[in-house]
Amino acid sequence: MNAQSPDGAPQDERTAELAARLERVHQRIEDASRRAAREKPELIVVTKFHPAEDVRRLYSLGVREVGENRDQEASAKASELVDLEGLSWHFIGQLQSNKARSVVRYASAVHSVDRDSIATALSRAVLGERENGGRADLDVLLQVNLDPAAEEQTRRGGALPASLPALADHVAVLEGLRLRGLMAVAPLGADPRPAFEWLHRLSGELQAAHPEATLLSAGMSHDLEDAIACGATHLRIGTDVLGPRPPMG
């Protein structure tokens, strides 16, 4: 039988594996930040497809920011892990308006707002939750499409850059939301550096109109160094911390 830490996390080979992986990622972040002469960004560990037990293990290793792509999975994990004080859930996947009410029950931030209707739905959901308790404002990042020339079926979501000013203005006046910055994914199969440099310029333009929108969510396992060099404040790292997706069933 595996022993457990005081917070309920199993002390086993998997915990040791996660600790080693996490240490390697932290070292990459530290090295890249030093080379770029930038402050170390926050690490969001993307736990999609991995069990709640792994999130508990990560918590025991000091992780307090986790990211999820699918509401059904995230909601179940958040409910199971409600005892983990200070654990913050970031919703980073494509969001449908009819899922907004569920998402605001557990998420501290949504990184994937790319149209007015999603923002409006989130605002209404936050206000609805406030009727039942003390729901704080929801941090919102606008997802920008850095590959607008891509075929529709290959896009990873996001607002076109030209539409960002109007979307930002819309979010900024919605009650219950805090406009905090931008999120993007580098185009598939392309050098991420030019895309992240573009994202950094867009971030500067956004901050000129909305000074509080200082966050830049960019960089995953394969391109975190480029993201850091271009000013990322938050990294979304999954595979390099958790390993390959576990088998289904």
Specify the residue positions occupied by each region the protein language model found.
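Gly/Pro- and small hydrophobic-enriched strand-loop and loop-to-helix capping segments
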Residues: A232-G249
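Conserved alpha/beta-domain cores
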Residues: N2-H222, I228-C230, L242-P244
